[in-house]
Amino acid sequence: MNIQALLSEKVRQAMIAAGAPADCEPQIRQSAKVQFGDYQANGMMAVAKKLGMAPRQLAEQVLTHLDLNGIASKVEIAGPGFINIFLDPAFLAEHVQQALASDRLGVATPEKQTIVVDYSAPNVAKEMHVGHLRSTIIGDTAVRTLEFLGHKVIRANHVGDWGTQFGMLIAWLEKQQQENAGEMELADLEGFYRDAKKHYDEDEEFAERARNYVVKLQSGDEYFREMWRKLVDITMTQNQITYDRLNVTLTRDDVMGESLYNPMLPGIVADLKAKGLAVESEGATVVFLDVFKNKEGEPMGVIIQKKDGGYLYTTTDIACAKYRYETLHADRVLYYIDSRQHQHLMQAWAIVRKAGYVPESVPLEHHMFGMMLGKDGKPFKTRAGGTVKLADLLDEALERARRLVAEKNPDMPADELEKLANAVGIGAVKYADLSKNRTTDYIFDWDNMLAFEGNTAPYMQYAYTRVLSVFRKAEINEEQLAAAPVIIREDREAQLAARLLQFEETLTVVAREGTPHVMCAYLYDLAGLFSGFYEHCPILSAENEEVRNSRLKLAQLTAKTLKLGLDTLGIETVERM
């Protein structure tokens, strides 16, 4: 149920009947304060200006044409021309009933699209670090939300599995295998990469061999392809452990690394030349873009092939976008890549559009994000100043959550405690990130994220268990409740019901904007409204069975909404805390 969309259409028709143009925008918003109703139409200002009349005068005319019978109990004009809409309690009750009768809580499915989501993208032969956290979990929230809404979602893990460094890595793997007489495990990927680089820098004979190996790998030599595959397999096996711990939905089947696009690059360059878009400049192949200017104010040259014949990330990104449209048949492509890559992506996409590889009707969207910072406001590092491994961060989260949970539940069995600590610890790390606007940097703070008050995972998980405890005390099952009517008489009942029915609107925003913090804010607000409702509207000690069952149904929909909302964020819920 999308009340915002319903009201938008009703108000728009009334505006047109009052003389507004057919493309008028009612600007329906959820009201910030209860005294302004549940929704507010703010579009009279802009339209009245076009019509040369006072906004309040237009609002009065709109009201004469606006039929919200059965939807709103009161509609009033406020200030210079805002229209405040108060939803009818009977309308709220009816739609709470409908939401409870639906597995999807009444959420409609929009027209199905094929949506490619590019996220996570770690590098081969390197361990995942905290810099991979945001892309991985924000992207996964987008995937979960879009899939719930009914879209066909293709996860694209754009792994860094190609490039000149692989000659060095294969040469070092070969040396390690010879010295260790047989198979070896890359237990310490970071150390492996570091040692390979050290040998490459210090041993000229090793470096020469590495350079030869690059040529052999790129020419398709089977031995070197096999060694390369081994490096990819070991890395992705380790990464899968991290993905599973993080409760993200990526699997090995979602890997679409740089190597996938490598065979396409010569054809891309040749085609761009044939189209007259790419030209030779100082030995390199360059595309000049009018939309980007250099310091002299001239069109900026974007190199797609170097003098030595090597390709660049831009070339790969051009091939990648083309592949996603032509082969994967994407209707929309979302990229969860940090904000530092923005200009690079814009240049690649400008070439893609110019060449006609992806039509303008297919959005290519950079859902960029800021950095994770330490308490000092600088990029999050270890005490020694090194990069924090993601696995180490999750280990610490688990340890801290374990202590916290044991303190609150000293008699809890060990296996139950471990399960709860995992849900709380991993949930805390994810929620702390997801609850911040992705476009900004944020401060990583253990104390804040593990707190049981405020907009945190432990608070949200506890809020969910608190609602469930009402049902345990009521000793009533869902089947018994199903036939009971919902009756809304109290203001707090109406406020809770209206917020519950805004779940679909929240999902729609997250799906459109890729902003998980909107869902976090909604769930936190919902938990707060339930708390006020629980305090002021007795459930188990209600004046009669009819009121008791009605309030139980509001509690039931609250629990289901909290659980489903947290699930779209990849946050586990627990039955008891």
From Swiss-Prot:
InterPro entries associated with the record: aa-tRNA-synth_I_CS (IPR001412), Arg-tRNA-ligase (IPR001278), Arg-tRNA-synth_N (IPR005148), Arg-tRNA-synth_N_sf (IPR036695), ArgRS_core (IPR035684), DALR_anticod-bd (IPR008909), Rossmann-like_a/b/a_fold (IPR014729), tRNAsynth_Ia_anticodon-bd (IPR009080)
Motif ('HIGH' region): 122-132
Localization terms from the record: Cytoplasm
Any one GO CC term of the record: cytoplasm
Top-level taxon in the UniProt lineage: Bacteria
Principal location listed in the UniProt entry: cytoplasm
One of the GO BP terms on file: arginyl-tRNA aminoacylation
Subunit comment: Monomer.
NCBIfam families, sorted: argS
Protein name: Arginine--tRNA ligase
Originating organism: Shigella flexneri
Lineage: Bacteria, Pseudomonadati, Pseudomonadota, Gammaproteobacteria, Enterobacterales
The encoding gene: argS
